Regions:
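Acidic/aromatic-lined carbohydrate-recognition and catalytic surfaces
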Residues: 1-79, 84-111, 115, 126-127
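Segments forming glycine/polar-rich beta-alpha architectures that bind adenosine-containing cofactors
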Residues: 120-133
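Carboxylate/His-rich catalytic cores and anion/metal-binding grooves
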Residues: 134-175
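Sparse, context-dependent recognition of short Cys/His-centered cofactor- or disulfide-binding micro-motifs
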Residues: 9, 121, 151, 155
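Residues that form generic nucleotide/phosphate-binding pockets
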Residues: 113-116, 120, 169, 173
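Surface-exposed loop/turn and secondary-structure junction residues enriched for glycine/proline
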Residues: 105-108, 132, 169
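Beta-sheet entry/capping signal
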Residues: 82-83, 131-136
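Conserved, charged catalytic cores of large soluble enzymes
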Residues: 178
Length: 178
């Protein structure tokens, strides 16, 4: 079973990049050093292939409190600190047979995972599925570990969980762009 139906499904699902785990990288350097950790942990990082989603001009007061922020274009000059929001798709890892972990925040990715794993068991044992395979257990569902700044003046890269539908779902729920 090659470590599946655990969260990796032997890399079978994430051969298709659209099903791979993602993170939102918040950084002051659009083209910084690659930091993606490709072991079995759910830590995001810079892959070197980040897609720019947004750019912000952030101004803090002398005590580190937010004075103002606004979304700007990538080539605009910032009055404060320019922050980039980059979409990073998890890279290949030997732990996942040179694939990546699943985007468990994506309904489409999870459906594909179930198709490749659970539905294969059902196909094999047919009507005996709920008897021969009474349950399928995994203790590993995860998504990118959320990182935080040490303080408001920190400019280290941080990652947070992300999936492609976040912007659409946010707008639907709150009536505003993220």
């Amino acid at each position: 079973e090659d470590r599946w139906p655990s969260g990796a499904a032997g890399g079978l699902v994430t051969k298709d990049e659209k099903y791979r785990a993602r993170c939102l990288l918040i950084t002051t350097e659009k083209d910084g050093e690659v930091t993606q950790n490709n072991d079995s942990r759910a830590e995001g990082g810079r892959t070197g292939n980040g897609k720019l989603l947004a750019c912000y001009d952030v101004i803090l007061d002398k005590d580190g409190y937010l004075e103002s922020y606004k979304r700007i274009n990538e080539n605009d000059e910032a009055k404060g600190t320019k922050w980039y929001a980059l979409l990073e798709i998890h890279g290949k890892s030997s732990w996942y047979n040179d694939q990546a972990y699943l985007d468990t925040l994506s309904v489409e990715a999870v459906k594909k995972f179930v198709e490749v794993t659970h539905e294969k068991y059902k196909e094999t044992v047919g009507n005996e599925f709920d008897k021969t395979v009474p349950a399928i257990f995994t203790d590993e569902p995860q998504f990118t570990r959320k990182q935080v700044f040490d303080n408001s003046f920190d400019t280290e890269d941080v990652c947070m969980p992300w999936t492609d539908s976040v912007e659409e779902l946010y707008k639907k729920a709150y009536g505003a762009d993220i």
